[in-house]
């Protein structure tokens, strides 16, 4: 018990010792790049410097004694995203600081700043990070070298220099320029360059050229002496080589300063003088003759190399790198070599960053006044702003490299740089070649308080000149602007100027003398004078002339004296045709100097509308004036030639040519024409008018007075102005305007200069010369004739009158005239010939379009021909035949052949007409052909009732051939059971089928009509299997049965037993009775890919809309006309025949005579409360088995407009109910018709959203959306317009597609008139679908819509239908109660008001009770050569079928209407039946009668309605089955 104080004291001492040994653990983060795409990554080499620094800090008792620095590191691969992710995770895990990252650091620095975590980077030169307060770095950024550069430039007084830099150095270049400018230094050039030659050549830049550097030197050498080069070492070598080539180093005047941020290495210093790829192949230390001179012109600013102790540091780094946590093993190759090569300066930067951080935290903890708990220590150590401020305030730190490094105000290390120069230094280069000179450090920069100080090491630099350093500019400046000119130079300059002035004056005098001499030569005729011997084809005695023609009126007015006109001739001068005008004189005529000058002036005049003066041939008594020849003669000749029609364009072009020519003359030295008249306006072969016979007035007047008589003299004066006639002067500009007015009058009147004035020329001249009295109009040509002829516009006539005004000053200038007559050309600036050429070019282009169109049509016809051939023969066979190649027979090991015939066909053929037999086989084989499309089979031929199909050729299909034939046969047998014979509906078609499997040989037989035939016993055996079979059964051979068994048991067979066959004896055969899910299934056939019927191809017709992309659906809202590429034959399902498709055939109603119409039309008592139920065409009777079992309906969710409704009739009109569906059918793809079994369900459906059921048409082209956008609002039927006494035909709607302006219908057009009925419509342009309109009428009227098929000129009419029930007679109630409400109760004639709403009015094929020659209706096809309508029936009202096929709610009564269809009436079906039959074959309807489809189906008990088809009396037999009319 007495020892417990001692034990307590011992425990306390132990606790105190443990507390004194406790150290807070701070985790530091390290981001490096060990792997990745960073080319300069250093993580593998320098990471050991971090662990070395951390180990030294943790072991140093004087540095962070209570703190233990732990390490966490990440390999960021130099990627910013990975580095950011690592920093985020480290911060969340509570690190105190981050060393790194390696590579980009700006984003990472911002992230650390956001959490105030200090970041010290050892390898990041991104200058943007300097502004972040929590960021510092031990690697000096590139911009830090600027301070050292400026210290070097200031030291040597290089205040003018040029900067050449690569793009990555642009921040350094910008900072250098900015700092140099602040220090009053001059930047001569600042120019960037591109070092990447591959990039230069890919982008076709200037740097791709071999002379790029030489050009750069040439552009800068004359304005600089000092270059600061910022770029790669290879670029430096190329640049200095170009300077050496330019001879810039010969005199030692140029200096290049290169900047290298890497630490100087003696072994790598060769890169400053030679390209890296040239060092290996060095043969000596001096690669060129002037190499030493060039090398001395280079100074390099590089990072100061470390001390010798640095080598020991690198070895320690290597050891630590191989230890945990990095465990980086050094390759043996590196171990054997000098490892110092692989430990870069960045290891020292990394080491310094750790030591700098530890020092700063230690200082902060020593200054901390709080108790140093773990939380306090972590808070101090992770305070980024405070840590970085502590580092910055210290200003300097001692680096492991042995240098004292300064830190600037942003926390960036300013680095330690040295200057390298070419000095004597013995060393061995990379090829172990001894060299005496090398780039070695010659100076360093001492870090001062503000700026580094430049200090030399051991002497001076060897300058290239051998003595003084190069100056930054020449002594007298780059442009000698600093040197004063001495007297000698000044005297020489003055002498040179005086001599130059004297030479210039002498030259001017000489040129003046020469020009005067040349003018004299021109005047004397050396240029304009023509030797008479040069003119060929002309003589004074044999003049080939083209005398001007005189009009008949002129000849009558002036007599024969008008024919003595002055004429011109043609000749040839130097091979060219020229126009020659002869001036004759009675005696020798001397050419004065003034005339010679004028001839020279005439020769210099050149303009498109001036007839060029070539020269003159001077003889003693005559002068020949030679000008250009104009093939069309003079304007006077054209005006007097009545065969030439002058239209407005022609006249405008001639007048404007004349105006342009006169403007040129008036602006020339000639000043005026003086002799302007229509005979002096000539026209070239291009119908361009040119003015001629201007100038030389003295010669012309003298020659004229001597050579012509008085009459001709005065006639030539008819174009002269009054003032010229009175004063006898040669001419003036205003006189030319007067002559222009006379010429304009000539052109428009074409009756001479003064029209029909019956005066002699002398009298006319006297009247013109006479001054008019006051208020009297001057004597001018009469203009009443051109006013009456309306050949001259008013503004032209006003211009003429202004131009021949008596007062010359009132006459306009030609420039004003041109503006006033601009309207004549209609804005066109080209002349006649240019416009004609433009028209010809358009015509040629049009011809090219026509040729292209014809070529396209030819290609289409070729495609049709190839299509026909491919239908007759297999595609591979047809292609060989098309290419002219022979088709060799091919043997097939196993195929399966199908044969079938019709039992009792011979008897049926004997009892039927040929046309009925043909139609029957066509319907049957149409079903067959549609079914076999879904199987891999080939139809060989059909002969009569025989149908032959094969599988396994011409393309082999392995063992599937038997299954393909078997599945096809089962479906054909099922379809036959559903099929009904059109002319014998009570009889069942008995098909007998046989199948056999075996080898065959297939080949083409024949040349004229080649056929693809099969040969071999297999064909005969298959035929025997069919002939020995039974009706409605499939008889197969034993081989076929075995082939089917190989397919997995998908087919059900029944053994028949032994059957004796001709040529085979007793053979075992089988019945094929069915198939299960393992059988070969029918492949889906895309309806879009199915080819159209061969003989229903569209024919070109101008009636068709050229838009071939529009759907061919009749009477559809918002739809266009039928497509030329689309067939109007409705597309059926596999089980449907032509017989079962009659419900979609468009029919044409008959014309009803007015007498019958008046007799049969019942009174209108109002429309009652009936309403439209559906807009869908329903398939025939409920009992019809030809409708598909798998029909689909189109269920659409349409937008509702209001409540529920449709269109109902009440009182005297139709009332549009709300909730009408407005979704256009173009938005919904049509679907199949529902089966007859579904019809009662539709009839009982009272839902307003009843589905619209449509038969799918062959044309599935979508409606163009632009037409949907441009459609007009639908026109509704106003209830007020169906008055009691109104039933006239209704034109409603808007012609949306045709754009017919008459298509717009107003409310006043929507009346019905009892005195009118429906117009006949053209059904030959019908579309693929027609939907019946189901109606109910409570007052005995059945309004029906009729829509013409000739869209867009369509007409929709509402006509009163129905007559008294019961035998076609009396009251409308009679027999009404006997009419059933559904299709299986058929009746003919009228429709009673009590009839059920859901009883549809449908179309069907003619029954046996009506002979085919009486069934006159159009088969729905494309436009044909002849439209035929059936003859009228037995009287009664015509009924048209509903056209409301839009996908909308029943009762939504919207109509289309175009212009009246009176011009589209069908031609009557006249002529013999043979003619009609041949016409339908041409139409593509096959051999069926073109009259076989004008049919209709009415519910039983419905009488009196004129359907537009041949009427048929109701019979008991007809009432028991589907009534076929």
Swiss-Prot record:
Transmembrane domains' residue ranges: 494-514
Residue ranges constituting the Protein kinase domain according to the UniProt record: 547-824
Main subcellular location of this protein, as a coarse class: membrane
EC number: 4.6.1.2
Matching InterPro entries: A/G_cyclase, A/G_cyclase_CS, ANF_lig-bd_rcpt, Cyclic_nucleotide_synthase, Kinase-like_dom_sf, Nucleotide_cyclase, Peripla_BP_I, Prot_kinase_dom
Tissue expression from the record: In the adult, widely distributed in the head and thorax with highest levels in the optic lobe and central brain and expression also detected in the retina. Expressed at similar levels in adult head and body. In females, highly expressed in oocytes with lower levels in the digestive tract. In mid-embryogenesis, enriched in the circular visceral mesoderm that overlies the migrating salivary gland and in the fat body that underlies the gland but at background levels in the gland itself.
Class in the EC hierarchy, top level: lyase
Glycosylation sites: 74, 184, 222, 338, 383, 394, 416, 428, 458
Zinc keyword on record: no
Entries under PANTHER family matching the protein: GUANYLYL CYCLASE, RECEPTOR-TYPE GUANYLATE CYCLASE GYC76C
Purpose of the protein: Guanylate cyclase involved in the production of the second messenger cGMP. Acts as a receptor for the NPLP1-4 peptide and modulates the innate immune IMD pathway in response to salt stress by inducing nuclear translocation of NF-kappa-B protein Rel which leads to increased expression of the antimicrobial peptide diptericin. Plays a role in Sema-1a-mediated axon repulsion which is required for the correct establishment of neuromuscular connectivity.
Similarity-based family: Belongs to the adenylyl cyclase class-4/guanylyl cyclase family.
Designated name of the protein: Receptor-type guanylate cyclase Gyc76C
Gene name of the record: Gyc76C
């Amino acid at each position: 018990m007495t020892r417990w104080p001692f034990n307590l004291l011992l425990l306390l001492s132990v606790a105190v010792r443990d507390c004194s040994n406790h150290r807070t653990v701070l985790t530091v983060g390290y981001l490096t790049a060990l792997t990745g795409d960073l080319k300069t990554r250093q993580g593998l080499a320098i990471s050991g410097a971090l662990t070395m620094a951390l180990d030294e800090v943790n072991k140093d008792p004087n540095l962070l004694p209570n703190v233990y620095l732990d390490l966490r590191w990440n390999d960021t691969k130099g990627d910013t995203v990975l580095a950011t992710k690592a920093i985020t995770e480290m911060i969340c895990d509570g690190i105190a600081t981050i060393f790194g990252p390696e590579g980009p650091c700006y984003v990472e620095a911002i992230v650390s700043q956001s959490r105030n975590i200090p970041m010290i980077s050892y390898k990041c030169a991104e200058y943007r990070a300097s502004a972040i307060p929590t960021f510092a770095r031990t690697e000096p950024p590139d911009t830090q070298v600027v301070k050292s550069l400026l210290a070097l430039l200031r030291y040597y007084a290089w205040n003018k220099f040029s900067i050449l830099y690569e793009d990555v150095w642009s921040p350094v270049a910008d900072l250098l320029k900015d700092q140099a400018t602040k220090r009053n230094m001059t930047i001569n050039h600042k120019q960037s360059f591109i070092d990447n030659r591959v990039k230069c050549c890919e982008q076709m830049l200037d740097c791709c050229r071999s002379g790029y550097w030489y050009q750069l030197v040439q552009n800068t050498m004359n304005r600089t002496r000092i270059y600061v080069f910022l770029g790669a070492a290879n670029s430096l070598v190329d640049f200095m080589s170009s300077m050496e080539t330019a001879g810039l180093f010969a005199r030692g005047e140029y200096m290049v300063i290169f900047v290298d941020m890497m630490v100087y290495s003696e072994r790598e210093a060769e890169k400053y003088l030679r390209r890296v790829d040239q060092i290996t192949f060095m043969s000596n230390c001096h690669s060129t003759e002037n190499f030493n001179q060039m090398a001395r012109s280079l100074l390099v600013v590089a990072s100061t190399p470390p001390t010798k102790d640095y080598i020991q540091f690198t070895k320690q780094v290597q050891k630590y790198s191989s230890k945990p946590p990095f465990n980086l093993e050094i390759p043996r190759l590196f171990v054997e070599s000098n490892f110092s090569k692989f430990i870069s300066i960045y290891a020292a930067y990394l080491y310094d960053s750790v030591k700098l951080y530890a020092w700063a935290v230690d200082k902060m903890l020593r200054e901390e006044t709080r108790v140093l708990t773990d939380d306090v220590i972590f808070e101090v150590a992770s305070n980024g702003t405070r840590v970085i401020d502590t580092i910055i305030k210290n200003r300097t730190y001692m680096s492991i490299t042995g240098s004292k490094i300064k830190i600037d105000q942003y926390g960036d290390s300013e680095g330690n740089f040295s200057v390298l120069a070419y000095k004597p230094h013995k060393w061995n280069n990379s090829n172990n070649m001894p060299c005496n000179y090398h780039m070695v450090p010659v100076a360093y920069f001492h870090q001062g308080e503000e700026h580094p100080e430049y200090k030399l090491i051991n002497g001076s630099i060897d300058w290239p000149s051998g003595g003084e350093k190069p100056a930054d500019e020449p002594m007298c400046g780059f442009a000698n602007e600093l040197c004063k000119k001495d007297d000698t130079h000044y005297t020489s300059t003055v002498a040179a100027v005086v001599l130059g002035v004297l030479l210039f004056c002498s030259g001017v005098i000489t040129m003046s003398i020469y020009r005067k001499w040349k003018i004299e030569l021109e005047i004397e005729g050396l240029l304009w004078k023509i030797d008479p011997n040069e003119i060929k084809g002309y003589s004074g005695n044999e003049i080939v002339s083209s005398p001007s023609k005189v009009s008949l009126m002129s000849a009558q007015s002036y007599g024969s004296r008008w024919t003595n006109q002055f004429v011109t001739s043609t000749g040839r001068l130097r091979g060219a045709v020229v126009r020659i005008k002869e001036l004759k004189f009675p005696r020798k005529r001397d050419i004065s100097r003034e005339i010679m000058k004028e001839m020279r002036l005439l020769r210099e005049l050149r303009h498109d509308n001036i007839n060029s003066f070539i020269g003159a041939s001077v003889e003693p008594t005559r002068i020949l004036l030679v000008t250009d020849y104009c093939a069309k003669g003079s304007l006077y000749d054209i005006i007097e030639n009545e065969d030439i029609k002058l239209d407005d364009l022609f006249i405008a072009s001639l007048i404007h040519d004349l105006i342009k020519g006169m403007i040129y003359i008036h602006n020339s030295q000639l000043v005026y024409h003086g002799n302007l008249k229509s005979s002096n306006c000539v026209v070239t072969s291009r119908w361009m008018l040119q003015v001629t016979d201007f100038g030389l007035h003295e010669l012309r007047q003298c020659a004229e007075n001597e050579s012509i008589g008085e009459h001709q003299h005065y006639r030539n004066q008819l174009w002269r102005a009054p003032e010229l006639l009175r004063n006898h002067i040669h001419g003036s500009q205003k006189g030319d305007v007067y002559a222009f007015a006379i010429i304009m009058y000539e052109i428009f009147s074409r009756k001479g200069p003064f029209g029909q004035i019956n005066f002699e020329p002398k009298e006319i001249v006297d009247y013109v010369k006479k001054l008019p009295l006051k208020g009297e109009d001057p004597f001018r040509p009469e203009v009443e004739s051109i006013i009456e002829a309306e050949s001259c516009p008013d503004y032209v006539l006003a211009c003429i009158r202004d131009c021949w005004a008596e007062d010359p000053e009132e006459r306009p200038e030609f420039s004003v005239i041109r503006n006033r007559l601009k309207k004549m050309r209609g804005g066109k600036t080209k002349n006649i010939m240019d416009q004609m050429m433009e028209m010809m070019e358009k015509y040629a282009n049009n011809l090219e379009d026509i040729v292209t169109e014809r070529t396209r049509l030819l290609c289409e016809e070729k495609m049709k021909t190839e299509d026909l051939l491919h239908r007759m023969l297999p595609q591979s066979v047809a292609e060989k035949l098309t290419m002219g190649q022979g088709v060799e027979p091919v043997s097939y090991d196993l195929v399966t052949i199908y044969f079938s015939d019709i039992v009792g066909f011979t008897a049926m053929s004997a009892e039927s007409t040929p046309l009925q037999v043909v139609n029957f086989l066509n319907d049957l084989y149409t079903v067959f052909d549609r079914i076999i499309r879904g199987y891999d089979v080939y139809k060989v031929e059909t002969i009569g009732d025989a149908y032959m199909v094969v599988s396994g050729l011409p393309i082999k299909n392995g063992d599937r051939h038997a299954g393909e034939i078997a599945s096809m046969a089962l479906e054909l047998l099922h379809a036959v059971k559903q099929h009904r014979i059109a002319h014998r509906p009570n009889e069942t078609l008995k098909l007998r089928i046989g199948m056999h499997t075996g080898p065959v040989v297939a080949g083409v037989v024949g040349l004229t009509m080649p056929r693809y035939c099969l040969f071999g016993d297999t064909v005969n055996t298959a035929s025997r299997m069919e002939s020995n079979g039974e009706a409605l059964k499939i008889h197969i051979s034993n081989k076929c049965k075995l082939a089917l068994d190989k397919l997995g048991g998908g087919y059900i067979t029944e053994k028949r037993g032994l059957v004796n066959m001709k040529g085979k004896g007793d053979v075992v055969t089988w019945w094929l009775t069915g198939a299960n899910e393992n059988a070969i299934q029918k492949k889906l056939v895309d309806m879009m890919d199915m080819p159209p019927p061969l003989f229903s191809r569209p024919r070109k017709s101008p009636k068709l809309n050229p838009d071939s992309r529009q759907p061919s659906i009749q009477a559809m809202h918002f739809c266009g006309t039928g497509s030329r590429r689309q067939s109007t034959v409705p597309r059926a399902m596999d089980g449907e025949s032509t017989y079962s498709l009659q419900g979609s055939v468009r029919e044409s109603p008959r014309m009803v005579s007015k007498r019958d119409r008046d007799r049969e039309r019942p009174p209108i008592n109002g429309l009652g409360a009936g309403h439209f139920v559906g807009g869908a065409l329903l398939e025939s009777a409920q009992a019809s088995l030809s409708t598909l079992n798998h029909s689909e309906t189109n269920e659409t969710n349409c937008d509702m407009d209001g409540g529920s409704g449709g269109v109902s009739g009440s009182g005297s009109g139709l009332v549009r109910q709300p909730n009408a569906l407005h979704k256009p059918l173009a938005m919904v793809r049509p679907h199949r018709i529902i089966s007859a079994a579904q019809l009662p369900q539709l009839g009982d459906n009272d839902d307003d959203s009843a589905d619209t059921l449509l038969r799918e048409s062959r044309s599935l082209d979508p409606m163009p959306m632009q037409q949907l956008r441009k459609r007009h609002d639908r026109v509704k039927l106003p209830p007020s317009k169906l008055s009691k006494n109104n039933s006239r035909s209704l034109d409603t709607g808007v012609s949306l597609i045709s754009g017919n302006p008459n298509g717009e219908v107003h409310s006043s057009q929507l009346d019905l008139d009892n005195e009118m009925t429906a117009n006949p419509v053209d059904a030959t342009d019908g579309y693929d679908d027609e939907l019946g309109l189901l109606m109910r009428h409570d007052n005995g009227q059945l309004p029906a819509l009729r829509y013409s098929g000739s869209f867009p000129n369509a007409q929709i009419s509402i006509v009163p239908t129905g007559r008294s029930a019961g035998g076609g007679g009396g009251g409308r109630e009679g027999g009404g109660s006997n009419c059933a409400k559904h299709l299986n109760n058929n009746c003919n004639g009228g429709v009673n008001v009590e009839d059920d709403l859901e009883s549809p009015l449908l179309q069907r094929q003619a029954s046996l009770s009506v002979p085919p020659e009486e069934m006159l209706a159009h088969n729905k096809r494309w436009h044909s050569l002849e439209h035929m309508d059936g003859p009228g029936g037995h009287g009664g009202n015509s009924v048209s079928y509903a056209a409301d096929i839009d996908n909308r709610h029943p009762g939504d009564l919207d109509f289309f209407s175009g212009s009246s269809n009176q011009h589209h009436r069908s031609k009557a079906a006249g002529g013999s039946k043979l003619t009609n039959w041949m016409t339908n074959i041409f139409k593509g309807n096959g051999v069926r009668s073109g009259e076989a489809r004008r049919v209709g189906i009415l519910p039983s008990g419905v009488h009196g309605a004129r359907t537009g088809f041949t009427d048929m009396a109701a019979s008991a037999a007809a009432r028991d089955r589907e009534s076929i009319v």
